[in-house]
Amino acid sequence: MGQKVHPVGIRLGIVKDHTSVWYADGRNYADYLNADLKVRAYLQDKLKSASVSRIDIARPAQTARITIHTARPGIVIGKKGEDVEKLRQDLTKQMGVPVHINIEEIRKPELDGMLVAQSVAQQLERRVMFRRAMKRAVQNAMRIGAKGIKIQVSGRLGGAEIARTEWYREGRVPLHTLRADIDYATYEAHTTYGVIGVKVWIFKGEVIGGRTEELKPQAPAPRKAAKK
């Protein structure tokens, strides 16, 4: 059975950037890495309803700069900036260095892999049929301008006795093309029957000359579906 490399990891330094940017010697590397994991877990827990896609962490000159990519910046910032200021104070205490927080809004959440995976998982937890949830997400992404999208769900789908995997795809998802800008994300849906895994691949175009091809809305391609 063929195994696939992580679509983001293989493209780091080509069309994808690292989410943690800092340098550490051998003594501090593990501490920095552990601190990053704790910061991300803390923010994901605090901002569950804020549609957070990605958290970037940089450590320039004895400070920390955290960039939160979210589709709902108002929830992160709070009334008159109270919520984001409290986050900054908590993170400064946790990391032990001054923290600066930047908020970046995601203009098209339908084209963000993590937000699409979260949306599908939330629908599965509300007992929406998995085929309907996948089809709706695929249609929305293609309507906004994705070149291709694939969604896969695995587990006890519909409460079945035996776990299985099903997927739905439209357009192209060229995993072997390194210049292809593919957004990949995974998420878990916790249902009464157990955990259902959700994987999303979104092909946004090829990066040529340092910029991605302009995304244009297009008509949906013929449906392609299969199951294992």
From Swiss-Prot:
Which biological processes are named by the entry's GO terms? Answer: translation
Q: Which InterPro entries match?
A: KH_dom, KH_dom-like_a/b, KH_dom_type_2, KH_sf_prok-type, Ribosomal_S3_C_sf, Ribosomal_uS3_bac-typ, Ribosomal_uS3_C, Ribosomal_uS3_CS
Write down the SMART domains for this protein, in alphabetical order: KH (SM00322)
Question: Which is a Pfam family this sequence falls into?
Answer: KH_2
Q: Which SUPFAM superfamilies match?
A: Prokaryotic type KH domain (KH-domain type II), Ribosomal protein S3 C-terminal domain
Q: Where is the KH type-2 domain?
A: 39-107
Keywords (alphabetical) are: Ribonucleoprotein, Ribosomal protein, RNA-binding, rRNA-binding
The Gene Ontology CC terms held by the record are:
cytosolic small ribosomal subunit
Q: Which Gene3D superfamilies match?
A: 3.30.300.20, Ribosomal protein S3, C-terminal domain (3.30.1140.32)
* Any GO MF annotation of the entry: structural constituent of ribosome
Which top-level group of life is the source organism from? Bacteria
Family matches, as CDD domains: KH-II_30S_S3 (cd02412)
Subunit arrangement? Part of the 30S ribosomal subunit. Forms a tight complex with proteins S10 and S14.
Q: What does the UniProt function comment say about this protein?
A: Binds the lower part of the 30S subunit head. Binds mRNA in the 70S ribosome, positioning it for translation.
Protein family: Belongs to the universal ribosomal protein uS3 family.
Q: Which NCBIfam families match?
A: rpsC_bact
Q: What is this protein called?
A: Small ribosomal subunit protein uS3
Q: Which organism is it from?
A: Ectopseudomonas mendocina (strain ymp)
